[in-house]
Amino acid sequence: LGNHDWETPGAKPYLDYFTLPGNERYYDFVKGDVHFFAIDSDEREPDGITATSKQAAWLEQALKKSTAAWQIVFMHHPPYSSASHGSSEELRWPYAKWGADLVLAGHDHTYERVEQGGIVYVVNGLGGNRPYPFRQPVPGSVIQYQKRHGAQFIEASKSTLVSRFSTIDRETIDAFSLEAPAKPAP
């Protein structure tokens, strides 16, 4: 859930409108070779947003149980961001240690790729509204962009995950790939 969803008591309109798995605030689903994990990054989340919260314990266990080729965690508030809203440091959980391959967020109306703690974080809030300015780059910031709206495209196979951010004019601004680690022989 995002900050605007929580502006109504208990995020009720959002939760009434959408039918989502689990408790509907944080949940997971599998699509092809990717296991997606949604977490509620808002400070009003009843189960907490710190690395020791009930929600984090759920994520840690769910990631460790996943058998998909790729595990992607997504949320609204970014753990790392160089833009005007800045980083939500309480969301700097040990995602890589728990088994995540990629962390996606929004909130700041920018595109930024950050590499921290053995994992890639992407902030992509350029789907609409006006872009935000950048401030001081956070450690590990690889690329920052906020000139044109755009979208992120992710393609995954069992061995490779490719992410590409393109503007509405179809100009590719950033692209990166992740290779799945070799599985040990039985």
Model features per residue range: what roles?
Residues 41, 75-78, 107, 166:
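Short, well-ordered beta-to-alpha junction loops that form the rim of enzyme active sites
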Residues 1-70, 90-102, 110-157:
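Extended active-site neighborhood of metal-dependent phosphoesterases/phosphodiesterases
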Residues 66-82:
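Short acidic, glycine-rich surface-loop motifs adjacent to enzyme active sites
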Residues 82-88:
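Active-site His/acidic residue clusters
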